[in-house]
Swiss-Prot record:
Belongs to the UPF0303 family. This is UPF0303 protein Oant_1766. InterPro entries: PduO/GlcC-like, PduO/GlcC-like_sf, YBR137W-like. NCBIfam families: PRK02487.1-2, PRK02487.1-5. The lineage of its organism: Bacteria, Pseudomonadati, Pseudomonadota, Alphaproteobacteria, Hyphomicrobiales. It comes from the Bacteria. Pfam families: HbpS-like.
Length: 169
């Protein structure tokens, strides 16, 4: 399969993920349960990551696992800024860079010190409220960061993570 074909399929699947993974409500308890799930998966699978769950005005959850580095915290901050700006998955924006209608265009004049175009940031969308924050993972290759977030959010919401997973590359 050509890379462009894979990107189109992956973008379409990420849009489906964004439409399907909607929380009925979201608070500190939801953030803790979801963050704990992400960390548990990472520990069980020996993944060196940092993860953060934040609303626009404050951080609700932060954790790291063995193998993560101080750089991961900075990546979390920059990915969060991208989700806050565009209300979209950071990995979708990565894949859209080869398209004419890309959202993360250079003309947007975003400072690379504050914005990271890398997978692993996903919007927290609440029914009736819209996007209120982000779930972020850093430490793995960007597609794997994204997949870890999707797996955990889908499981947390009682949805099938396999049905929502990106196609293998």
């Amino acid at each position: 399969m050509a890379q462009g074909d894979d990107s189109k399929q992956a973008i379409a699947q990420i849009i489906r993920q964004e439409q399907a993974l909607i929380f009925p409500s979201f608070d500190e308890n939801e953030a803790f349960a979801l963050g704990h799930r992400i960390r548990d998966i990472a520990v069980k699978e020996k993944l060196g990551i940092a993860t953060e769950i934040s609303l626009w005005d404050r951080q609700l959850f932060y954790a790291t696992t063995a193998g993560s580095t101080v750089d991961n915290q900075e990546w979390l901050r920059r990915k969060f800024n991208v989700v806050r700006r565009f209300h979209a998955s950071t990995y979708r924006l990565v894949l859209e860079q080869n398209r004419d209608d890309r959202m993360f265009a250079l003309h947007k004049a975003l400072n690379v010190e504050d914005y990271a175009l890398a997978g692993g940031g996903f919007p927290i969308r609440v029914a009736g409220a819209g996007v209120i924050g982000a779930v972020i993972v850093s430490g793995l290759p960007q597609r794997e960061d994204h997949n870890l977030v999707i797996r955990a959010v889908a499981e947390h919401l009682g949805q099938d993570p396999v049905a929502l997973a990106l196609p293998a590359v």
